């Protein structure tokens, strides 16, 4: 283990249970997951917990519109959220719901402790009431003009424009967001948390390093104005927990939502004998608790939440880490432009590891907004992950398998390996401080060194000389060892790739194993690890994300004529297919023939003759549609070497873009044979 073991509890903000996860949400879960996985990789006891935020009027009203009970709706959303997170490789130790037994008990317990300590006040307030729906209006269901900056169409609790918070009654020209009616004032007894009683503690805590300086400076405005008592109750009808000893009164969603962190962890503790709730939440706990949140909810997590914990006798968070918003192509996410992208839409078209890496490459420990530039996204993934990282293995692994029985050599010159290992402390510090972008740059700089080493050593040339076989063996072994170190450094960011590399290397990638000696170790046969991002997949995401009222055109039925219906010509090849007319050498020289490895082969729906091939050129991947379906099953092609025309102009087909042509011989149907080069040929080599 790298250092003494820490006990860490880490959380992400709870997604609201009335809609799907989108790529704006995913920034936070990817950021938290990377940090959590890093802590586990270092050997620490780290628990990453989360839950759906499942209470409030919005959920109650949406369930009514759907004609179902709120419990049914939030259960359905919970399943969808968990599936999206799992498919993005978000590794929660527990994902729960605020509508749970644990959260009800903890919310009541904290409230009663606050009440008994004198921190709960009651008073009658005049509240906005919808006369058409006969209900008091929650903050978010009243809209009007901000009383501070005069921005229109703002919610009743805070202003998106200036960030001010206020009471719904402070709005100018309020309207009910439920019915559109002008609300009337009606008296109601409400419960308040005495936040001003904690002003001294909060002032010190927010300046203690527990939150970022930018956030502490912003919260300073609250202290300048003087903290106010916080309304924690809502009137029936309301979907949530009823306040003890107060029939018809319910906890405001922002009271029980952060308690949901505790509720989810309590649920985990109750299912595991090795976890104790008090070890993490008791006043004298030595464990670390970290909250990752968006900058829009810092007041709840950095003022109300630590004050509630302090007043109820629990420990406060070690730190609250805030991040900025996500923009797409330099602008706010837009449904009309197709840039308001749901997690599921992305997953239907692209590898989640791509987005994990791109977000990591742009994240820092600050609260800056992050722009998802889709062209830059494709270029960075293709350059860094495919061109630099995976290319390192694809260029060298084949020699180990074919020439050296799959076993790695003892490397004499380990100077480059020592350079790689010498970066582990810096990379660990960057992960720890959430400077993921800087960490990615350090790792990719190492990848550049490794690729330059392979290019200079040129094992594909060494392998041709019988006197240099051992040198070639060492170069390839060294390259794969450097590749192992790089993927270990990237394991928190690219967990699926790391799993695949562990299977390929037949060796666990852990921080403690970074300096392992793998001389004589046997590896498995190399398989393609990652494909290039194709802009057509990004275009498909944008198109699927647009608000479009025009029904999609029904897919055309496939031609029912079978490939086997084509008559077979039994004449000799030259008679049935004479040699074409003569061309000049200059014309032939324009054709760039390259060795390619078939990384992936799959059927093309509605195409009787085509297979879709992903061809690895040893640093670049091209997609080709080949008319060889009658002769080959996709699974029989994967891993084979073949010859392709690499500089053929891309051709847009009904099924996608074809970026070249594979060479095959034969009259057709089952009598087709793709060209397969002899052993020693490598992807990317020119055929002369």
Swiss-Prot record:
Residues 554-564 have a biased composition (Basic and acidic residues). Residues 552-576 are annotated as: Disordered. Its cofactor is Zn(2+). Keywords: Aminoacyl-tRNA synthetase, ATP-binding, Cytoplasm, Ligase, Metal-binding, Nucleotide-binding, Protein biosynthesis, RNA-binding, tRNA-binding, Zinc. A motif ('KMSKS' region) lies at residues 332-336. The keyword Metal-binding applies. A motif ('HIGH' region) lies at residues 15-25. ATP binds at residue 335. Residues 587-688 form the tRNA-binding domain. It catalyses: tRNA(Met) + L-methionine + ATP = L-methionyl-tRNA(Met) + AMP + diphosphate. Zn(2+) binds at residues 146, 149, 159, 162. It is found in: Cytoplasm. CDD domains: Anticodon_Ia_Met, MetRS_core, tRNA_bind_EcMetRS_like. Transmembrane segments: none annotated. Its EC number is 6.1.1.10. Its main location: cytoplasm. Binds 1 zinc ion per subunit. It is an enzyme of class 6 (ligase). The keyword Secreted does not apply. GO terms for biological process: methionyl-tRNA aminoacylation. PANTHER family: METHIONINE--TRNA LIGASE, METHIONINE--TRNA LIGASE, CYTOPLASMIC. Is required not only for elongation of protein synthesis but also for the initiation of all mRNA translation through initiator tRNA(fMet) aminoacylation. Homodimer. Belongs to the class-I aminoacyl-tRNA synthetase family. MetG type 1 subfamily. This is Methionine--tRNA ligase. It comes from Shewanella woodyi (strain ATCC 51908 / MS32). The gene is metG.
């Amino acid at each position: 283990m790298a250092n003494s073991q820490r006990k860490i509890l880490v959380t992400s903000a709870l997604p609201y249970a009335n809609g799907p996860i989108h790529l704006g949400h995913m920034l936070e879960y990817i950021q938290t997951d990377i940090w959590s996985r890093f802590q586990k990789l270092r050997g620490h006891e780290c628990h990453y917990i989360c839950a759906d935020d499942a209470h409030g009027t919005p959920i109650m009203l949406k369930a009514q519109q759907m004609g179902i009970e709120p419990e049914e709706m939030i259960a359905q959303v919970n399943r969808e959220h968990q599936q999206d997170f799992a498919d993005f490789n978000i590794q929660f130790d527990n994902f729960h719901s605020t509508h749970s037994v644990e959260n009800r008990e903890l919310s009541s317990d904290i409230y009663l402790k606050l009440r008994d300590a004198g921190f709960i006040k009651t008073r009658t307030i005049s509240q906005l009431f919808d006369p058409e729906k006969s209900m008091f209006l929650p903050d978010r269901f009243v809209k009007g003009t901000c009383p501070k900056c005069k921005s229109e169409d703002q919610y009743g609790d805070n202003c998106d424009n200036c960030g001010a918070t206020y009471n719904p009654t402070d709005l100018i020209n309020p309207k009910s967001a439920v019915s559109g009616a002008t609300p009337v004032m009606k008296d109601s007894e409400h419960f308040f948390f005495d936040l001003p009683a904690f002003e001294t503690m909060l002032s010190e805590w927010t300046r203690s390093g527990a939150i970022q300086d930018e956030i502490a400076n912003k919260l300073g405005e609250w202290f300048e104005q003087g903290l106010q008592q916080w309304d924690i109750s809502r009137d029936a009808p309301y979907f949530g927990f009823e306040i003890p000893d107060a029939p018809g009164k319910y906890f405001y969603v922002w009271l029980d939502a952060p308690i949901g962190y505790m509720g989810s962890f309590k649920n985990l503790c109750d299912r595991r004998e090795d976890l104790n709730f008090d070890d993490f939440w008791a006043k004298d706990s030595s464990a670390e608790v970290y909250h990752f949140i968006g900058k829009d909810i810092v007041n709840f997590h950095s003022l109300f939440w630590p004050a509630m914990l302090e007043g109820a006798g629990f420990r406060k968070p070690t730190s609250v880490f805030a991040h900025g918003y996500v923009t797409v192509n330099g602008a706010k996410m837009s449904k009309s432009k197709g840039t308001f992208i749901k997690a599921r839409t992305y997953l239907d078209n692209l590898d989640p590891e791509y987005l994990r890496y791109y977000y990591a490459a742009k994240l820092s420990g600050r609260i800056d907004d992050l722009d998802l530039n889709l062209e830059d996204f494709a270029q960075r993934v293709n350059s860094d992950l495919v061109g630099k990282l995976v290319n390192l293995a694809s260029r060298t692994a084949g020699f180990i398998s074919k020439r050296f029985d799959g076993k790695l050599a003892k490397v004499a010159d380990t100077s480059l390996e020592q350079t790689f290992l010498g970066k582990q402390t810096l990379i660990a510090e960057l992960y720890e401080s959430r400077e993921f972008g800087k960490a990615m740059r350090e790792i990719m700089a190492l990848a550049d060194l490794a690729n330059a080493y392979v290019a200079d050593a040129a094992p594909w040339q060494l392998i041709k000389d019988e006197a240099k076989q051992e040198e070639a063996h060492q170069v390839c072994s060294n390259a794969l060892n450097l590749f192992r170190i790089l993927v270990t450094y990237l394991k928190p960011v690219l967990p699926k790739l790391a799993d695949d590399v562990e299977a390929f290397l037949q060796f666990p990638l852990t921080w403690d194993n970074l300096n392992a000696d793998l001389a004589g170790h046997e590896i498995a046969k190399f398989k393609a690890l990652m494909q290039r991002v194709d802009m057509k997949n990004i275009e498909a995401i944008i198109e699927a994300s647009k608000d479009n009222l025009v029904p999609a055109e029904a897919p055309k039925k496939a031609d029912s004529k079978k490939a086997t219906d084509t008559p077979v010509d039994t004449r000799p090849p030259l008679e049935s297919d004479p040699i074409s007319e003569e061309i000049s050498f200059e014309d032939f020289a324009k054709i760039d023939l390259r060795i390619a490895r078939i990384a992936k082969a799959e059927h093309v729906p509605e195409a009787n003759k085509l297979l879709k091939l992903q061809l690895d050129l040893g640093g670049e991947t091209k997609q080709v549609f080949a008319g060889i379906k009658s002769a080959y099953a996709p699974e029989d092609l994967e891993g084979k070497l073949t010859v392709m025309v690499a500089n053929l102009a891309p051709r847009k087909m009904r099924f996608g873009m074809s970026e070249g042509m594979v060479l095959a011989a034969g009259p057709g149907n089952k009598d087709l044979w793709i060209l397969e080069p002899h052993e020693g040929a490598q992807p990317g080599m020119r055929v002369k």
